[in-house]
Each structure stands twice: as structure tokens, then as C-alpha cells.
């Protein structure tokens, strides 16, 4: 079984490569690809770490060698956010990069699962879907946007606010992966399996912080980058869990995937997902929303739908 990481020399990619080397199951092949000539060296560097995961690096314009035989492809390639940029500002550059990479996936390993980390996820996942559709290989079970960082942040910030042990806290996060499209369901938040209670003021402040946490990091880094380390750790959590699901382990994670037709949700939406041998096996119920959450959901739908349309129109102008 093989994982290919595209964008392995970037701020997220290098850390993610390290974490995958440490956490993937014994015997996994890890292929690292980036346009940068340092990529083979990154693979040599992590190959000195004593785990039973083999790492090989590839650089240049063509990722085909890295993709051969891949079961799971994780895409982190693209430019990062800088101060003053929104995730949507990244679109013009990253849309082309992801489109070209997914075209290669469609050609070289069309049955592989694809996890997209590169932003703007809301728009790039629909681009990938259209590229795969054009190539005649689209399978909605095998394409997902990685929104794990929103879940991780919700868990961390909620545990800090409520002074609970972070490992015991669970907070669902649905919707999209930018600003107001990120919707934490604090009405369903649990600690040690018991519901947590919040004042309305706490709900509004916590929701705002989770939605704008990316900007918090960009500003704190004072022009020196965006959220790379927490994103890499979240990406590793997701990639390892999904890879183990492909090997037969039970796995439920939140991810931005194609919705069921007639569900009332936008065409792509972050749901709780049961992953299995073929990728997405089942979209699980989102559960009952509070009035506040329902209002936020109604607000985010047109924003997310516009993001999705932007992606589809990029491939089919």
C-alpha cells in the first residue's frame, strides 16, 4: 500500500512528510513529490528515522513516478496565505496547481483516494471533481477536502474555555473550510461523553474564534507564513485514519465531500463520514442543530454554493 504526498517540500508538506513517516502502518510506501529540487533530499532525511515506512522523493514538473501505484494521494501543493489574503485570494494560483496535479492522478492512479489540504478547499475540491469527471474516473467515494484542522481547533479552544482535558472533548464541525462557512456545533459538544453547556456569549465568541483561527495564525506570524504545523498535524491525523480505513479499520472523520442528492446541503459539504475499504462508505447524520446553528447554516449555504460554482466554472468556463 502506498501514500503519495504532493507538495512535500512546502511549509505543510515537510512536516506532514515527517509525521507520515512516523505514523503510517508498518510496510507502507511513502512517495514525496514537489516541483522543488530539494524533495529527494527531504526523503533521504526522513528515511534515516527508524520506522518501517519507506520514503522516496521525486522532483520536477511531472509527478507520475510518485503517483504510480498510490492508494491515497494527499495534496498540499500551492502557495500559503499571507497577511491581508483570504483563502479565496489564493484561488487564482492554487486552482491551476491542483487542476494539473489531479489531471495526473486521473491518468496514473485513477482509483486512488484523494485528500485535498491546499486552500481554498471549498473551491478546489469541486475543481478536482470536475477534472476527474472529464477524465471519466470520478468516484465521489474517493475525493475529500481535509477539514480536520477545524475540528482540532474546536476541540482545543473548547477544552481551554471549559477547562476540560482536551482528549475528552468532542466538537462536531460541519460546512466548509473558510471563515463563515465553518460551523462548529457547540450544542453537540461533549466532554467524557457528557454535554457541555455554554452561554450565548460564549457560543458566539467561540464560533468566531474557530472560524477565524487561520487569520489568528497569519497575523501572529507577522508576515512569516500561515498555519503550517497545526495543519500538518491535522493532515496526518486524517491521512493515517483514512489509510487505515482502506486497510479495513473502522474510521469516522469529518471531511468535505459530495453530499447526498436532495439532502438540502450544498453539493459539497463537511459531514461526519464513515470511511472504509473504498473510501467514503457512509455520510452519517449531522444531528439536531440549535436555532443559532440553523441560522448560521442558512447563512453559510449561499457562500459555500458560490465557492463551489467558482470551482466548477474554472474547469468548465
UniProtKB/Swiss-Prot annotation:
Pfam families: Ldh_1_C, Ldh_1_N. Its EC number is 1.1.1.37. It catalyses: (S)-malate + NAD(+) = oxaloacetate + NADH + H(+). One of its GO terms (molecular function) is L-malate dehydrogenase (NAD+) activity. It is an enzyme of class 1 (oxidoreductase). NAD(+) binds at residues 7-13, 34, 94, 117-119, 231. Keywords: NAD, Oxidoreductase, Tricarboxylic acid cycle. GO terms for biological process: carboxylic acid metabolic process; tricarboxylic acid cycle. The keyword Repeat does not apply. The active site is at 177 (proton acceptor). Substrate binds at residues 81, 87, 119, 153. Signal peptide: none annotated. GO terms for cellular component: cytoplasm. InterPro entries: L-lactate/malate_DH (IPR001557), Lactate/malate_DH_C (IPR022383), Lactate/malate_DH_N (IPR001236), Lactate_DH/Glyco_Ohase_4_C (IPR015955), Malate_DH_type1 (IPR010097), Malate_DH_type1_bac (IPR023958), NAD(P)-bd_dom_sf (IPR036291). HAMAP family: Malate_dehydrog_1. Homodimer. Belongs to the LDH/MDH superfamily. MDH type 1 family. Catalyzes the reversible oxidation of malate to oxaloacetate. This is Malate dehydrogenase. It comes from Actinobacillus pleuropneumoniae serotype 3 (strain JL03).
Amino acid at each position: 500500500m502506498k501514500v503519495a504526498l504532493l507538495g512535500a517540500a512546502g511549509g505543510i508538506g515537510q512536516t506532514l512528510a515527517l509525521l507520515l513517516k512516523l505514523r503510517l502502518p508498518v510496510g507502507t510506501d511513502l512517495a514525496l513529490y514537489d516541483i522543488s529540487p530539494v524533495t529527494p533530499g527531504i526523503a533521504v532525511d526522513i528515511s534515516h528515522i527508524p520506522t518501517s515506512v519507506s520514503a522516496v522523493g521525486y522532483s520536477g514538473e511531472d509527478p507520475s513516478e510518485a503517483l504510480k501505484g498510490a492508494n491515497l494521494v494527499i495534496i498540499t501543493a500551492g502557495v500559503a496565505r499571507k497577511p491581508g489574503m483570504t483563502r479565496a485570494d489564493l484561488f487564482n494560483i492554487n486552482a491551476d496547481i491542483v487542476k494539473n496535479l489531479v489531471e495526473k492522478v486521473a491518468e496514473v492512479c485513477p482509483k486512488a483516494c484523494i485528500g485535498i489540504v491546499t486552500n481554498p478547499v471549498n473551491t478546489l475540491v469541486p475543481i478536482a471533481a470536475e477534472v476527474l469527471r472529464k477524465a471519466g474516473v470520478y468516484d465521489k467515494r474517493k475525493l475529500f477536502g481535509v477539514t480536520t484542522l477545524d475540528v482540532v481547533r474546536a476541540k482545543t479552544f473548547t477544552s481551554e474555555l471549559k477547562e476540560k482535558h482536551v482528549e475528552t472533548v468532542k466538537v462536531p464541525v460541519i460546512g466548509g473550510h473558510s471563515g463563515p462557512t465553518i460551523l462548529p456545533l457547540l450544542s453537540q459538544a461533549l466532554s467524557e461523553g457528557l454535554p457541555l453547556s455554554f452561554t450565548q456569549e460564549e457560543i458566539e465568541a467561540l464560533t468566531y474564534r474557530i472560524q477565524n483561527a487561520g487569520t489568528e495564525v497569519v497575523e501572529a506570524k507577522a508576515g512569516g507564513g500561515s498555519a503550517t504545523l497545526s495543519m500538518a498535524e491535522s493532515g496526518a491525523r486524517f491521512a493515517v485514519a483514512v489509510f487505515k480505513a482502506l486497510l479495513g479499520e473502522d474510521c469516522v472523520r469529518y471531511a468535505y465531500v459530495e453530499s447526498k442528492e436532495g439532502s438540502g446541503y450544498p453539493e459539497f459539504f463537511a459531514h461526519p463520514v464513515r470511511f472504509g475499504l473504498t473510501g467514503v462508505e457512509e455520510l452519517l447524520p449531522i444531528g439536531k442543530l440549535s436555532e443559532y446553528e440553523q441560522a448560521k447554516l442558512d447563512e453559510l449555504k449561499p457562500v459555500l454554493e458560490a465557492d463551489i460554482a467558482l470551482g466548477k466554472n474554472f474547469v468548465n468556463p
